[in-house]
Every structure is written in structure tokens, then in C-alpha cells.
Regions:
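Polybasic/polar functional segments that serve as interface/processing modules
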Residues: 1-87
């Protein structure tokens, strides 16, 4: 297997009261401090009109050859984060 980078997954429970824009701001700050280039970032409040997702948000920082994502399920207090950093 060829080494390509680091992949981290975080699942947290009892994470109540989170704000997507606050988390996105912190994700952007962490990515910048880690020396990566943020090429796009957004946070979407869920459910979107016509969608069937439970209440919460999805926040995304697309990085140069990497990504940092967060999915938050407000009613269940669940936060799932995924971080991939290329080399």
C-alpha cells in the first residue's frame, strides 16, 4: 500500500447546541494553521427546502487535495467529522 496522507474520523454524541457557521469558522482556522489551502467553504442548514434530512447542518472546507467535513444531527446531538490531509 502506498502512503498518501492522513485520514481521521470523529463521531461525537451529546453534542447539543452547535452552530454550523461557528464550526466552519473553526474548521477554516484549523486548516489554515495546518498549512493547507482552503479553496472553498460552506455551511448548509438542514433540512433544505423540500429535503428530508433531519434538522442540523453540514459544513465543508474543501482543501487543496484534501477535505474537512462535519455533519451535525441536532435532534440526536450527533456530530460526525471527517478529515483527509494529503501528505
Amino acid at each position: 500500500m502506498i502512503y498518501k496522507g492522513h485520514h481521521y474520523i470523529l463521531d461525537a454524541s451529546e453534542a447539543y447546541g452547535l452552530c454550523g457557521h461557528w464550526l466552519l469558522k473553526n474548521m477554516n482556522e484549523v486548516a489554515t494553521k495546518a498549512g493547507t489551502t482552503v479553496v472553498f467553504k460552506t455551511s448548509v442548514q438542514l433540512p433544505v427546502t423540500g429535503g428530508s434530512s433531519p434538522p442540523g447542518f453540514t459544513s465543508v472546507c474543501l482543501l487543496d487535495e484534501s477535505h474537512l467535513t462535519a455533519h451535525y444531527y441536532e435532534d440526536k446531538g450527533l456530530l460526525a467529522m471527517d478529515v483527509w490531509k494529503h501528505r
